[in-house]
From Swiss-Prot:
GTP binds at D16, H17, G18, K19, S20, T21, N133, K134, I135, D136. It catalyses: GTP + H2O = GDP + phosphate + H(+). It comes from Citrifermentans bemidjiense (strain ATCC BAA-1014 / DSM 16622 / JCM 12645 / Bem). Transmembrane segments: none annotated. The lineage of its organism: Bacteria, Pseudomonadati, Thermodesulfobacteriota, Desulfuromonadia, Geobacterales. Residues 4-186 form the tr-type G domain. Keywords: Cell inner membrane, Cell membrane, GTP-binding, Hydrolase, Membrane, Nucleotide-binding, Protein biosynthesis. Its main location: membrane. One of its GO terms (biological process) is positive regulation of translation. GO terms for molecular function: GTP binding; GTPase activity; ribosome binding; translation elongation factor activity. Belongs to the TRAFAC class translation factor GTPase superfamily. Classic translation factor GTPase family. LepA subfamily. This is Elongation factor 4. The keyword Protein biosynthesis applies. One of its GO terms (cellular component) is plasma membrane.
């Protein structure tokens, strides 16, 4: 295939703006998928992707299209994940393209994540053109949205394509625009092979399958390839393209997008953003922009039924095969038993993993409150990174603690700005800017501690704005903060699973809230139970669950007072003894409810 006739493009869109449906129409129009095989959201292979309507892993498909100029073109659609947690993956997928379609819902306008991804595309020097989707809706306002795109992003929209993926309107116009506007890939098939690895997943029969975009050179079955970040080498067993099922081809050459199967055992070896080259004729330098992805949010996962521990371990190992950005280590808790401490890229990533464990592996799990990575500077000059309250050293050994801050951009309709500002202030935010994008939409930019965002920020953001807000964030830096460890004690015993790292100013309110919640949840016993919240040795809140009392005098009809007194004294003694040996059984609901207490 002549390199001039290849077009590599991706579709940039916010969740729910119709990206996957548009991809379905392009597949049908070019005859890539017959009507019989058709199913909605063809490229979203996981059930969860279909259900939540989001794309989690990048997918690619090759479309053959005969344009109006009579020439045959190969169009490679690289489908990118659209969510904030997967920004690095998006940036790598975009680097594999020369152009992008910015799909915007004609009834809703520009959203925060669309913006973030468009900026990534423009940074990667992609040719971006605009498609206004859902123009068949009665609420569609194409002219207003065009003006908004020009105002906010600065893209020219006078020749934007008006389309409705659902009705199939405008599909041909989009394909023609791709051929006309997006430049062909630059590359030289005679140079040593150099390819960008932009996704990988595990197949239980063939090992790891990697998706690559060849920049220079060619690759075919039998070649020995090398991954440049770890210098590991493999023999190519199969190479080919997706159309949309996997199809082997004699070779892949510069400018093309396809897959390579080379007996790679672990996804962790095939890292997104790595450069693939030939072992015996390597390229001189790796492609720029590769970085290791580090988990940002941590949470403990414990099976409700302890006999499911082995199943949970196997399930995590299977998920890890497909998702190298996710990490897990075994941990134990006195209250919850054996479980795992898991690291995620962000909140959505965490929810998806939990949901997949419950849905695909039928596990019932308890999740501890999410935490972030703190840096603890010791009085002896040491620096340690910790992920949970139980790892925090005693106060006298800490010089100071630093926590990660993020820069959050929130897009909201202007009726809700007051509520958003109040929420950000409550979460210890520092206001950076408020910008009116249009008379009705506002962008609010805040610096926020990630610790405050991981708990319930997103849910509260959505409820304040009735679901209209969109959030995008990036990591800024670490800053010194007054953080303390808040312990919850029951009859003087610390319950490790409920310990939190929290800002000093909030400890009192949070402690009081937790103990009053616990009081409602712990069933009454035969002895009284003291529930306390403490910072260090100082108790800051207390509630008492009163004892149940058996009427020991029921069988004394009338009779002597000394007899009654003897029975009451005996009961009192018994309760005292019981309190010393009695264990308080905490119901599972108590843990689950406490994790939901608002921060």
């Amino acid at each position: 295939m002549v390199i001039e006739h290849i077009r590599n493009f991706s579709i940039i869109a916010h969740i729910d703006h119709g990206k996957s449906t548009l991809a379905d129409r392009l597949l049908e129009f070019t005859g890539t998928v017959s009507a019989r095989e058709k199913q909605d959201q063809f490229l979203d292979k996981m059930d969860l992707e279909r259900e939540r309507g989001i794309t989690i892993k990048a997918q690619t498909v090759r479309l053959n299209y005969r344009a109006d100029d009579g020439k045959d073109y190969i169009l490679n659609l690289i489908d990118t994940p659209g969510h904030v947690d997967f920004t690095y993956e998006v940036s790598r997928s975009l680097t594999a393209c020369e152009g992008g379609l910015l799909v915007v819902d004609a009834s809703q306008g520009v959203e925060a994540q669309t913006l973030a991804n468009v900026y990534l595309a423009l940074d990667a020097n992609l040719e971006v053109f605009v498609v206004l989707n859902k123009i068949d809706l009665p609420a569609a306002e194409p002219e207003r949205v065009k003006a908004e795109i020009e105002e906010i992003i600065g893209l020219d929209t006078h020749d934007a394509v008006l389309a409705s993926a659902k009705e199939g309107i405008g599909t041909k116009d989009i394909l023609e625009e791709i051929v006309k506007k997006i430049p062909p890939p630059k590359g030289d098939a005679t140079k040593p092979m150099k390819a960008l690895l932009f996704d990988s997943w595990y197949d239980q029969y063939q090992g790891v399958i990697i998706l690559v975009r060849l920049v220079d050179g060619t690759v075919k079955k039998g070649d020995k390839i090398q991954l440049m970040s770890n210098r590991k080498s493999y023999e190519v067993l199969k190479a080919g393209v997706f159309s949309p099922e996997m199809r082997e081809t004699p070779m892949l050459s510069a400018g093309e997008v396809g897959f390579i199967i080379a007996g790679i055992r672990e996804v962790a070896d095939a890292k997104v953003g790595d450069t693939v080259t030939l072992l015996h004729n390597p390229c001189d330098a790796a492609l720029p922009g590769y970085k290791e992805v580090k988990p940002m949010v941590f949470s403990g996962l414990y099976p409700i039924d302890t006999s499911q521990y082995e199943q949970l371990r196997d399930a995590l190992a299977k998920l890890k095969l497909n998702d190298s950005s996710f990490s897990y280590d075994p941990e134990t808790s006195l209250a919850l038993g054996f479980g795992f401490r898991c690291g995620f890229l962000g909140l959505l990533h965490m929810e998806i993993i939990q949901e997949r464990l419950e849905r695909e592996f039928n596990l019932e799990l308890i999740t501890t409150a999410p935490t972030v990575v703190y840096r603890v500077h010791g009085t002896d000059g040491s620096l340690t990174s910790i992920q949970s309250a139980n790892q925090l050293p005693p106060t006298q050994e800490i010089a100071y603690v630093e926590e990660p801050f993020i820069l959050a951009s929130i897009h909201v309709p202007n009726d809700f700005v007051g509520g958003i500002l109040a929420l950000c202030e409550e979460k210890r935010g520092v206001q950076r800017e408020i910008k009116y994008l249009t008379p009705t939409r506002v962008m609010v930019v805040y610096e926020l501690p990630l610790n405050e965002v991981v708990l319930d920020f997103y849910d509260r953001l959505k409820s304040i704005t009735k679901g209209y807000a969109s959030l995008d964030y990036e990591l800024l830096d670490y800053r010194q903060s007054e953080l303390v460890r808040l312990n919850i004690m029951i009859n003087g015993e610390v319950v490790d699973a409920l310990s939190l790292i929290i800002h000093k100013d909030k400890a009192y309110y949070r402690g009081r809230e937790l103990v009053s919640k616990m009081k409602e949840l712990i069933p009454r016993q035969m002895f009284e139970i003291a529930i306390q919240a403490a910072v260090g040795t100082k108790v800051i809140a207390r509630e008492t669950v009163k004892a149940m009392r058996k009427d020991v005098l029921a069988k004394c009809y009338g009779g002597d007072i000394t007899r009654k007194r003897k029975l009451l004294e005996k009961q009192k003694e018994g309760k005292k003894r019981m309190k010393n040996v009695g264990n308080v059984e905490l119901p599972q609901e108590a843990f689950l409810a406490i994790l939901k207490v608002e921060g």
